[in-house]
């Protein structure tokens, strides 16, 4: 990976293409957005693979993140809550959803990199196509 710093932004020259990074969200992705995106990219892909191995066919997974940051400590992230909403024709029991969430936490390299410094929760909720989220 190669990064070039110019003016108010950094441009990463990565395998997929260039990635503009800046604290100014009109000229690049904010570092916070990229940090959270890396966690979602890793955990979301892993969740999809786990569901496939468990033969839980799903139409879509939506992931919502909320965070708590500490302005007194360089605005660091102190807490992240990730909720994955799985849309499927079949529902998961609460026990299976908890087991799957635990597998994601234990096997996601990005989550494991920060789990000791950030209070992180990961929830899996399912909804069948004709029902509400469970």
What is the predicted function of each stretch?
Residues 1-38, 48-134:
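Extended beta-strand/beta-hairpin segments
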Residues 45:
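Short glycine/serine/threonine-rich phosphate/pyrophosphate-binding segments
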